[in-house]
Amino acid sequence: MKIQHIIHENQLGLLFQQGSFGLEKESQRVTADGAIVTTPHPAVFGNRRYHPYIQTDFAESQLELITPPTKKLEDTFRWLSVIHEVVQRSLPEEEYIFPLSMPAGLPAEEQIRVAQLDNPEDVAYREYLVKIYGKNKQMVSGIHYNFQLSPDLITRLFRLQNEYQSAVDFQNDLYLKMAKNFLRYQWILLYLLAATPTVESAYFKDGSPLAKGQFVRSLRSSQYGYVNDPEINVSFDSVEKYVESLEHWVSTGKLIAEKEFYSNVRLRGAKKAREFLTTGIQYLEFRLFDLNPFEIYGISLKDAKFIHVFALFMIWMDHTADQEEVELGKARLAEVAFEHPLEKTAYAVEGELVLLELLSMLEQIGAEPELFEIVKEKLTQFTDPSKTVAGRLVRAIEQAGSDQQLGAQLAQQYKAQAFERFYALSAFDNMELSTQALLFDVIQKGIHTEILDENDQFLCLKYGDHIEYVKNGNMTSHDSYISPLIMENKVVTKKVLQKAGFNVPQSVEFTSLEKAVASYALFENRAVVIKPKSTNYGLGITIFQQGVQNREDFAKALEIAFREDKEVMVEDYLVGTEYRFFVLGDETLAVLLRVPANVVGDSVHSVAELVAMKNDHPLRGDGSRTPLKKIALGEIEQLQLKEQGLTIDSIPAKDQLVQLRANSNISTGGDSIDMTDEMHESYKQLAVGITKAMGAAVCGVDLIIPDLKQPATPNLTSWGVIEANFNPMMMMHIFPYAGKSRRLTQNVIKMLFPELE
């Protein structure tokens, strides 16, 4: 099968580079010193019966992290990053993810528990593996790389060739060519990427075959790794022979099931191999790869891209390896696996030749410049083995003292990195924090997640056959269409609440700046709030707590409000403290005191300097990707300073509280303090009633309350509603400035999927 001519003549180079990718990464859970734990798989990850992202491989201690299929490797790595961060932050404080493939700190065999799965057949299969291979070999971890050619490419190639009549036969032979050539040249990938040079002597039943201080390239890929008995030989000459030989070994009892065949290439896309004859091979799984301990996720994006183009070259080349050449490739793999990592391989000339031809392919298919650089970098490693992963690893182990010590150091380092921005998912940092928090929780619980529109924060969540759509973290089908429209319009909100019998402050609405300013006399010396009719997140709001003192400030506040909307409200200011109630369904789940943006004087620094110092806090940022927002020093803040007789250059006295905003929104630099347990129950019930009046399932209700300990009475002096908000912020409740965290995203999930275990 010769396809490079078809690709070149029909300008299919770009389509040739497309495909689908998925990674499966195995890792041991360990203690701080690198010893494998004997604890059960953490219950926080839900049930392994259905979890699409977090599974266990052989043992309870052996995590398997699985990315969903993606069209771009960059997206595959985003998912791998997110799943890692979820796992790292969910593990017990004293547990870590071991970054090396070969196990260290092995417990006694009787302490190693096979994965305790719901399906008895899955447990029985693992118990069978124990009898055949022993437990220690099963504790080896690695990376499985799943790759599917673009179905459009396969269709185009089939139409443009004249050798095959059957599309299934063509597809099978295309993938089989990739598999056979991969097995022939797999030693190249092992030489460059192997990372299992040693293992503790306890791993071996009959003593270590390694001399003291001896290092090799890959124990995992050697006869001492996770391999079948040499007697078991499955033919790759054709799909028919592959199926027949695999079924033969199962029928004779040499393999308990087809999945026990541990080839470095596995044909995928069917439950039974025989199905390939009618439905075709759908993708390949490459199982060769050791964990790269120098990469936080066990593999680098550059190496994943190299593997991709290497796999493409396996079908680009005109030659197709036969079974004899496949066996030669296996023998060469075993030989290279036992070479010293700092010595040149005996087959360097062949390796260099293959990569030079690979570079030629990249040129002909119009590959990105980055791919040329990646391959050229690999090419240099044939003359300098110290640059290979195994070469680097040997030196790192010698420096650390042992593989276990190195693994422990890196495990602690990688866990610390996962907590640097503990409130965010680094790969989806462009999404708002509430959506990131929801993503964290659904991935943790095992709900299948599809990001429909990243910029619009739109998710599709699936549990079994149950599908829910979520926008902005808590906007769902449980809300009526009209409810956000009511809450968006502050005038309508007040009228609806007033009709429902809730206390609302009196207000006057204006549609022109001139008329509003001309009404100054109505509000002189009155404490008022000036705000746009339709707003959220505190935009355009000015509060005169001490009363309107002059026309100029009044006009300025109106001007700011009119920038946000064509209609503005001037509302009576209610005396008391403002609290945000987060309501979901029939329950107030969280109550927050939002302290307006402020700084505290120290008799040394100016207001501007104090603001800059407070803004340095790691939780402060743009407010959408951080739990707290940096404090601004704009027109509204300077008006607030003026009310206090200050400017940005004033130096406040020690412990002097300087208010920079009167409104308490976190989105304008405020501080968040959880008050859920302190708030009297009567106000929580009021918030639920207000939410129902809005026709909402989820609502952020803002109440002014003079005394949160006293029960509510019908009077406006007891409490008043100033706003009801659709899509209320959750992050300020999840990560408050002070007080107890309320993980509201979990409540959203319970609302959407009440059947979830």
Swiss-Prot record:
Cofactor binding summary note: Binds 2 magnesium or manganese ions per subunit.
Residues that bind Mn(2+) 1: 702, 723
Residue numbers binding ATP: 521-580
GO CC annotations on file: cytosol
Chain intervals for the UniProt region annotation (Glutamate--cysteine ligase): 1-337
EC category name: ligase
Pathway recorded for this protein: Sulfur metabolism; glutathione biosynthesis; glutathione from L-cysteine and L-glutamate: step 1/2; Sulfur metabolism; glutathione biosynthesis; glutathione from L-cysteine and L-glutamate: step 2/2
A Pfam family per the record: Glu_cys_ligase
Domain of life: Bacteria
Cofactor or coenzyme needed: Mg(2+); Mn(2+)
Binding-site residues, Mg(2+) 1: 702, 723
EC number: 6.3.2.2, 6.3.2.3
Membrane spanning stretches: none
Residues that coordinate or bind Mn(2+) 2: 723, 725
Coiled-coil residue spans: none
Keyword Metal-binding carried by entry: yes
Assigned keywords, A-Z: ATP-binding, Glutathione biosynthesis, Ligase, Magnesium, Manganese, Metal-binding, Multifunctional enzyme, Nucleotide-binding
Gene3D superfamilies, per database record: 3.30.590.20, ATP-grasp fold, B domain
Similarity-based family: In the N-terminal section; belongs to the glutamate--cysteine ligase type 1 family. Type 2 subfamily.
Quaternary structure annotation from Swiss-Prot or TrEMBL: Monomer.
Physiological role: Synthesizes glutathione from L-glutamate and L-cysteine via gamma-L-glutamyl-L-cysteine.
Protein name from the UniProt record: Glutathione biosynthesis bifunctional protein GshAB
